[in-house]
C-alpha cells in the first residue's frame, strides 16, 4: 500500500492553495465544502475566486508565492501551471511538515486527492495512487450509480436513531436486521429528501415497532427494452438489493448479470399466445415470497405499466396488504424508435403517438378509423402475428398503402434488426422477423435512412 487513506477534519483550520485558475478553483471547492479556513495565493484570479472573497468565504493574497503563508497551515495544495513553482511550494511545505498536494504530479506531493463520492456523512474515496486517474474516475462513476442520492440523508438520520434502536433491540443481530431494513426503505429516503416530517415519523415508527420477521415488499421494476445501459439508476439499485428477482423472457442476460449474486431468480417467461407461467401463478409467487419477509423485485421488460400487466400484479399485492413500489423503465416504443433512427413525433409528420397492443382478442375491435388518420405515429406491441390483419384493417379504413412502416426486432440490443417498407408490405415483412418485435407505422419512418445512427456503430 503506497498511500494510507485518511479523512481529514479541516473545519476552521487554515489551508493554503497556490494558484488562481480553473484547477485551483476545483480544489478550493473541496476545501470550502470541508469547512476549511482557506487562503489562496496567486498572481491573478479567475472571477469565481473574487466572488468567494467578496462573500467572505476565503482570503485572497495577490502576488508571488509567499512561504510565510504556510506557517499556520494544516494542509497546502500547489495548483499552478508552473512546475518549478509547484515544486517550491511542495518543498516549503515539506520543511514545515505540512502535507502538500501537487496537482498532476503525485511524485512531488506528500498526499494525493482521490475521486470522491459525497453522500455526506457517508463518503467514499477512490484512488489509483496517481497511476491511472481515468480508471479511478470510471470506478467512481460506477459506484455513484450504485449509491442512492439520498443515502447521506438516511445515514445522518440513522445517527439520530442510534440510542433509541439500542434500547428497542436487545441483540446485535436484531439491530443489524433493523438497520438493513431502514437503509433500503424507499419511503423513508424520499420523505427525508422532501423534509416531510409526518411521513418520516410514521415510517420510522412503523420500522421500529413492526416485528423483524414482518411481511416483505415487492418492487415492480422496468428493465427497459434490452440494452443494459438503458436500465435506470434506481432500477439498478433495486435489483442489487433484492432477495428474490422474478423476471420474464424480455429481460436481457446483460441485465440479469447485474442482479445481486445471492438473490433467488424465478423465471416466469411469457411468449405471445403462450404463457409459460399463468398470470395468477405469478401473482401468487410475488405474494408468497413477500409474505416470507423478503424484498422481491418483479423485473419486467420495458415499462411495467405499458402492456406489462404490472397493474394486475400490484392489485393482488394491494388486496393482501403487501407494501409495493414501482420503478418505471424505458418502454420499447421509445427505445426501439431511438435506436432505429425513427423519431416518434415530428413537427412536419406526427403530432401524436399511439401505443397499441397487437394482441387482438377474439371479438375485440380497435378504433381503426381513428388509427388510420394522418399526422400520427402508430406503435404496435406484440403485433407480429397480427401484422396482416393490421395491414388490412388500416387500408380498409383509409390509410394509404404507401404509408412507411418498420419492424424492429430485438430493439436496442446488439442483435437488433430493422426492416422497413410500406403498409401494403407489412404482412409479408412480418414473416421475415422474429419475436420480440415492434411495429412502427407513420411518415416518421421515412426519416430512418437519415437518422439511423445505431447501425453505423
Swiss-Prot record:
Chain residues that bind S-adenosyl-L-methionine: 225, 301-303, 306, 331-332, 382, 411
Domain of life: Bacteria
Chain spans, region Precorrin-2 dehydrogenase /sirohydrochlorin ferrochelatase: 1-204
Pathway: Cofactor biosynthesis; adenosylcobalamin biosynthesis; precorrin-2 from uroporphyrinogen III: step 1/1; Cofactor biosynthesis; adenosylcobalamin biosynthesis; sirohydrochlorin from precorrin-2: step 1/1; Porphyrin-containing compound metabolism; siroheme biosynthesis; precorrin-2 from uroporphyrinogen III: step 1/1; Porphyrin-containing compound metabolism; siroheme biosynthesis; siroheme from sirohydrochlorin: step 1/1
Keywords: Cobalamin biosynthesis, Lyase, Methyltransferase, Multifunctional enzyme, NAD, Oxidoreductase, Phosphoprotein, Porphyrin biosynthesis, S-adenosyl-L-methionine, Transferase
Keyword Iron: no
Residue list for modification Phosphoserine: 128
Any one GO molecular-function label of the UniProt entry: precorrin-2 dehydrogenase activity
Region named Uroporphyrinogen-III C-methyltransferase: 216-457
Gene3D superfamilies listed in its UniProt record: Cobalt-precorrin-4 Transmethylase, Domain 1, Methyltransferase, Cobalt-precorrin-4 Transmethylase, Domain 2, NAD(P)-binding Rossmann-like Domain, Sirohaem synthase, dimerisation domain, Siroheme synthase, domain 2
E.C. no: 2.1.1.107, 1.3.1.76, 4.99.1.4
BP terms from Gene Ontology: cobalamin biosynthetic process; methylation; siroheme biosynthetic process
Active-site residues, Swiss-Prot/TrEMBL: 248 (proton acceptor), 270 (proton donor)
NAD in keyword set: yes
Reactions this protein catalyses: uroporphyrinogen III + 2 S-adenosyl-L-methionine = precorrin-2 + 2 S-adenosyl-L-homocysteine + H(+); precorrin-2 + NAD(+) = sirohydrochlorin + NADH + 2 H(+); siroheme + 2 H(+) = sirohydrochlorin + Fe(2+)
UniProt-annotated binding residues for NAD(+): 22-23, 43-44
HAMAP family linked: Siroheme_synth
NCBIfam families: cobA_cysG_Cterm (TIGR01469), cysG_Nterm (TIGR01470), PRK06136.1 (NF004790), PRK10637.1 (NF007922)
Family recorded in the similarity comment: In the N-terminal section; belongs to the precorrin-2 dehydrogenase / sirohydrochlorin ferrochelatase family.
UniProt function note: Then it catalyzes the NAD-dependent ring dehydrogenation of precorrin-2 to yield sirohydrochlorin. Finally, it catalyzes the ferrochelation of sirohydrochlorin to yield siroheme.
Protein name per UniProt: Siroheme synthase
